[in-house]
C-alpha cells in the first residue's frame, strides 16, 4: 500500500544512482513525486524526525530482513548501558571466539584482542563490523543470547510490533525481521533519547591502528545535509538504508528497503529526502498522519527473499552476469571471425583446374 501525502510537483530532476556516490556534494531537486517511479523496489518511508509525521509511505508494514540495520537497535542498547553506568565508553572489551568467527564485514581482530567500547561503537556504525556487534552484545549482557532478549524487549517497548531479532548484527536468519515503520520508530528513539551520540552516525571514517575504515553510507559524502544513519545488506534483503538529513532546522529520515544495487538504494533515499525538503507547506498539505496514527496496512506481507533480483557477486547474480557477458563476447568474436572469413572467400580470385 502506498501513502503519499500532498503529492505535488516542485520542478527539477531526480538523483542519478551513478552520481550519488560522488565525492562532491550534490545540489539536486526532485521534480515529480517519488511515488510515480515504477522501478522502485521494496518498502520505503519518509518522515520528520521531530514528530514522526509521515511524508511518504510505501509498503511500510511489510516485513523485511533488516540486515545490518539491526545494528541501530544494538547501538541503542549500548547507549542505554553507557547512560545507566553499566559500562563506559573507555572500557576495554575483548574479542571472544564467537566474535572472531563472524564473517565480513568485520574488523578481523584475533581472539583476546581488546578495543574500547567507543572504538567498537564506531566500528559497528561506520564499518558495520559484525564482530564488533557481538563484542558489544557480550559486554552489555554477558552473551549474545541474553542481549537478543533485550533487543526484543526494547523493540516491544518502542512499539516495533512487527520486528523480531535473533542476533545482534543482522547476519542472515529467517526469523530476523522488521518493517520500514518499525525502523522509523527506532530511529526516532535513537535521535530523541541519545542526542549526545549523534556524532557516531555522521562519521565518514574511523582509524583503527594503521587502518582507515570508511563509512558504507555514500550520502554522507554526496548529499547535502546528510548526518546519518546506517546501511544494511544481505542477499535475501537486498540493499537497505536508513538515511537522515538536516536542513534549515528540519531533520528528515528516509527508510529504504530491498533495492537491487547500492547505487539505487542511495539514489532512492536521496530522492525521498529531496522531495521532503523541496515540497513547500508540507505541514498543512500532508495532514496529521504520523507513524502512530497511520493505519496498519491491511495487505502487509510477511518476509520474502529477493536474492534472485539482487545484483551482487556475493549473491551469485554478478557472477552469473559476468559469465553470460563472457559467453556473449566469445560468440561475438566467433561470429565476427566467421563473417570475416566469408568476406575473404568472396574476394578471392576464381581458379580453374
Region annotations inferred by a language model:
Residues 23-28:
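Sec-dependent signal peptide recognition
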Residues 160-164, 172-177, 181-353:
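Domain-terminus/edge residues, biased toward the C-terminal soluble/receptor-binding domains
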Residues 1-21:
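N-terminal secretory signal peptides that target proteins for export/translocation
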Residues 2, 31-181, 188-191:
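Active-site-adjacent loops and short helices of periplasmic peptidoglycan-processing enzymes
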Residues 20, 68, 262-265:
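Short alpha-helical segments used as structural interaction elements across diverse proteins
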